[in-house]
Amino acid sequence: MVTFSQKPAEVVKKWILIDAENLVLGRLATLVANRLRGKHKPTFTPHVDDGDNVIVINADKVVLTGKKYTDKKYYWHTGYIGGIKERTARQILEGRFPERIIEKAVERMIPRGPLGRRQMRNLRVYAGSQHPHEAQQPEALDVGTLNRKNKRIA
């Protein structure tokens, strides 16, 4: 028996559309990260970018459980002395770029390195219900029906 190793030329990428409305952030991010890496495919090869292209819409309607909506903090540093900054998940979701919550959650579930950066380029997140990828004919994936814990009605 020989271990299967897929070549980059053999990769077939599909387009997946996920509606994030009322979905739990961590559960959504886990599913998206696995789709981006290609771990759902029987032809998964760790060193090849064989994941799908994922489109997430309604990112501003994602749900955080518990007190994370008000208490979870995202930190960054400006580079200056004493330049540590923070924002809560609520400030980001109600701000100009609510899609960054999903991007950051998925980014932290993808391996760091050149392959991880290439896989992150296959993720498109939009705050509203409109997206410019109709020509790719994305296949809708209903994450809420996969597991009852994936969806929260607020």
From Swiss-Prot:
GO terms for biological process: negative regulation of translation; translation. Disulfide bonds: none annotated. Keywords: Ribonucleoprotein, Ribosomal protein. One of its GO terms (cellular component) is cytosolic large ribosomal subunit. Residues 129-154 are annotated as: Disordered. InterPro entries: Ribosomal_uL13 (IPR005822), Ribosomal_uL13_bac-type (IPR005823), Ribosomal_uL13_sf (IPR036899). CDD domains: Ribosomal_L13 (cd00392). One of its GO terms (molecular function) is mRNA binding. Part of the 50S ribosomal subunit. This protein is one of the early assembly proteins of the 50S ribosomal subunit, although it is not seen to bind rRNA by itself. It is important during the early stages of 50S assembly. HAMAP family: Ribosomal_uL13. Belongs to the universal ribosomal protein uL13 family. This is Large ribosomal subunit protein uL13.
